[in-house]
């Protein structure tokens, strides 16, 4: 059955001031691609970063490095830092390239100031925080950045524990996908899966599923995006120890 659909029928959230509508296919398409391609991007990072330490074991260079004066500190920290920089910069480049490609295909970036809630039936239409497309793109890029850093931590830790790059890749891949299944169970356990890289990159679900509410973990009570930042920071600091 075909016909007109009203704003109320589309379930658009109401705010104190009118929503801004515009042609925003560039932004909506970019958001959809980024939402669905975070796993592909993570696999790329795992492949690139898996040999960071394990390659040294297989080549015998580890014994030489660890026997030097700064082998156990400077060299290892430098490798972790390089891995984080690769992940962080790659995340920004990936997001920007996707947006530029969509802008080139749809002939521009019109609608940057349109509210994301006007993108009917999209993952971002039910986010209870009012943002325009440009603001939300920056938020998506931030969550991609956090997810990339978390993925880098995982890859480096597995690489340090394994003597072969292939085993490190498989191990990091299994651990990366492990939180996928508890999320499907829903409930409190499922909600906490957002702190892991496989889910933290999906900004639409992080902001919508958490419904901008406080999540308790005694003695702290924070919103889920804040928890993602906290746990990513903790994982990063621990990896340097």
Give short role names for the model-derived ranges:
Residues 68, 161-162:
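Transmembrane helix irregularities
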Residues 187-195:
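A cytosolic-side transmembrane-helix exit/cap motif
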Residues 4-56, 77-161, 172, 180-183, ...:
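Secretory targeting signals
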Residues 166-179, 195-198:
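Central hydrophobic cores of alpha-helical transmembrane segments
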Residues 66-72:
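Short helix-to-coil transition segments within interhelical loops
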Residues 157-161, 230-241:
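Junction motif at the cytosolic side of a transmembrane helix
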